[in-house]
Each structure stands twice: as C-alpha cells, then as structure tokens.
C-alpha cells in the first residue's frame, strides 16, 4: 500500500476543517499535532464570565462551531491512537489479502463502530462491495441472510424463505460481483449478539471461493467477551479461519488528553479549554474509554456554561463525574 490510508481520512488544513488555526512552521509533518503539542495560551485570571444572554449556547460561550463530544459516529473526529491505527490496518490487510475472516474486539465505547465507518469510507468501490451489517439480539439465520441480501439491493423471489435458498441467492450475488472485478466485504457490528447458528452461517459465507482465492471477507466487531465465547470447542472451525485479530483497549492518560484537545480543535476551539489537571481527572473518571470521555466532557461543558466558568477545571470534572 502506498502511504498510510488512515492518515488520508484525517482532515487536514486544506479543507478548512481547522479554520482559524494559525499557519504552522514549514516542514512540520502534521500541523494539527503541532498545534496540539504547542503551549496553550495562558488562562485568564478570572474563571467566571458575565451572565449569559438568553440566546447564548454553551457552544458560543466556549467558541465552538459544534459539539465536540456528541455520541454520533463522525470520522472527522477520529483521533488516531496507535491502538486504533493497528485495528484499522489489520482489518484493511485482511480485506486486501483475501483473508476470509478477521475480528476486532474491545470494551463497549472504545471505538469499534467508528473503525467500521472508517473502513466503509476507505474501501475502493471499484474493487470492493463493502456492507455494514448491524447485528441485533436474537436475529435468526434467515434474518441475517435477508439483511445482507437487502443491503445488496436484491429483491427476493417469491417463495424463498429458507436458509438454503437464501444462501444460494447470496452465493450467486458474490459470483456476479467477482465477475465485475469486485469482492463482497461484510462488516458485522455488534457481533456479540450473534447466535451460534448465525456464526456458522458466517463460516459458510467464508467458504464461498474459487480455486484461486476467497470471494468474500467478513470483518467481525464485538465486545471483548465475544473472544472468550469463541474459545469453546464448538467454534474451532470458525476460530481457525480468523487469521487477523485486533483488540481495542482504553486510552492511556496521554492519549486521552490529546483526544480531548483534538476534538475541541476540530470543533473550532483554538486555545486551551480544559486545564491540564482537569484532563488527568477526565482520564481517571472515564477509565480512558472514548464514550465515557465524551459523556464526561460534554456534561462538563454544559455545567461549566451554567456556572459561567471560562475554563474546565478539576472541581468541575469531579462534580460532573459524580452525576454520571
């Protein structure tokens, strides 16, 4: 692969994603990281601002264009830790090198769904047909196959209701894609909800092949307990097909601090908003889990706005942590 595909997904200064940021020194490899690492403007001595006007929001108060800590999955806010980069690259290599099954696991809220969206965004539609399949609890075998077939925009013939018939339709669709020069890439999110029967359906899909190559790649994203479940002997055949695996873990204190700063900058803030000690408190109370960080920081911004606090400090983080 030429270059780093994940780097290409992170917005740069050329698309106005960081409007208002001063020009960086020539030759710096990453102007955004230069800004993150640079000393922040000194905080004002006073920590309280005048009372809010009736129409003012916490975004205006903190000089933000949008909420940096919303729970929606937005690739523009992806902060590239080494751990997330590793997962992305492993899943990408599985696709590009015709590995039939690969898996990323991690605690809830560590960024698995965001990785699925980055893969969906990155994969070349001329070479691949990537589909994200969101698994729901108690989804049946036929329900799973119908979901995949629907994502392929294939109308089911009347009378096709059983697993065998659905698998035949899917296999024919995979062959058609192959003849077009494309490969089906199935990205299964929330795989910890898959039943044993559905796991064996995925194994069957992974067996669609020609003598020269595999014709599908299935990427499984699940909570950490799913990997424990697959250790049971009944899943030996499935587990042995998984050549690529990755594990997402909570962020370190350093990564957590950079994550918060990065998201604030993407949202339009160009100076320090969280005091350094407050960033340490964010990591301590969130455990370094991305979703928990977002919840705590968003609550801190709202609480800080109501208290007219121009910066987020440790006491404010502690108050908000007690509310979670």
Give the location of each predicted region.
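C-terminal alpha-helical "lid" subdomain
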Residues: 2-48, 258-261, 265-324
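Conserved NTP-binding/hydrolysis module of P-loop NTPases
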Residues: 67, 139-158
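Walker A/P-loop nucleotide-binding motif
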Residues: 99-118
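Short regulatory helix/loop adjacent to the ATP-binding pocket of P-loop NTPases
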Residues: 120, 226-241
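Conserved catalytic segments around the Walker B and adjacent sensor/switch elements
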Residues: 125-136
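Conserved AAA+ ATPase "SRH/arginine-finger" region at the nucleotide-binding site
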Residues: 135-137, 230, 243-255
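Conserved AAA+ ATPase "sensor/coupling" helix adjacent to the nucleotide-binding pocket
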Residues: 150-152, 224-225, 233, 254-270
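Conserved Walker B catalytic segment
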Residues: 171-175, 179-220, 233
